[in-house]
Amino acid sequence: LVYAYLTFLEESGIAPRLCVCSSPFTSAVGISSRAAIPFMLGFGCTVPAIDSLRAVDEESAKRASYILPFFQCSAKFPVYAAFAGVFFRREFSLVILPIYACGVCFALVFGLLLRLLGRQNRICDIVELPRYRMPSFSSVMRSSGEKCADTVKKIATVLLLISAAAWVMNYVTVSDSKSLMQCVSGIISPIFAPLGFGNDLSSASLIAGVFAKEGVLTSLSVFSGEGGVKYVLRELFSRASAVSFLTFFALYPPCVASITKMRSEFGTVHMIKCVMFQFAAAYVSSYFVYQILNYLAISLLR
């Protein structure tokens, strides 16, 4: 559906006009305005969003790939809804929308930072505006089908191997009836202590989230027992640490399908740079969010 939507925008003449409208923002971060469509697709799924960067010049596409995952994909919504339902029940509707807005703000801030560090000037590109037209259903389906098949062909093998590795980590016990996933999460959990969620279960859920963002809730539900996910969230997080966790979750590297797609489009070296940058951005942002909330002791977060 995402590929069909992208094809419709391109063939109808709407896409170039959307690019023109977004040019003040994209040029500010040193990226071609043609990257506006991939950014919008990022709210649906990061994989086709990365694929659509082919329409952007190589330099802008690489720079856009650093901040593209900051546009929150739909797979993250269940996690946001679960946390908001537990810690911000009365302010539920006022919490979800700012999360998505903050993702866009983080993308602009870190995009501007990348432009300044790279000493890149603002981009003023020219976009041709074709006439509006209604594309035929068959052409949309044919083009989107070709794009979908190409994506599956490129990432299927790697994704299958990584999924198998995730299964092994979850179900193979190492010692004391602990799975390999639990052992790994126990090793890395101290890293997240300054962020307010330095426990094994939170770390395990973040590892699961790398394989699929919905895996965060799945991982938590496995160990929730009869109490359910809500009980586990209340036990693991305070309001401040919950906001810190969501900040990290919103900014840390996307799922393996997206990472694999990034590798196929830009190469292994660039993919590693993107993952390291996104992890660093998530860690630093989450650290400051947690420390500031604790320092200010806002009544809402006590």
Which sequence ranges carry the predicted segments?
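Selected transmembrane alpha-helices and immediately adjacent juxtamembrane segments
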Residues: 1-11, 94-202, 272-302
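Hydrophobic alpha-helical transmembrane segments
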Residues: 9-12, 17, 37-55, 94, ...
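Juxtamembrane inter-helical linkers in multi-pass membrane proteins
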Residues: 16-46, 120-143, 187
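Membrane-embedded alpha-helical segments of transport systems
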Residues: 43-49, 66-81, 98-107, 211-217, ...
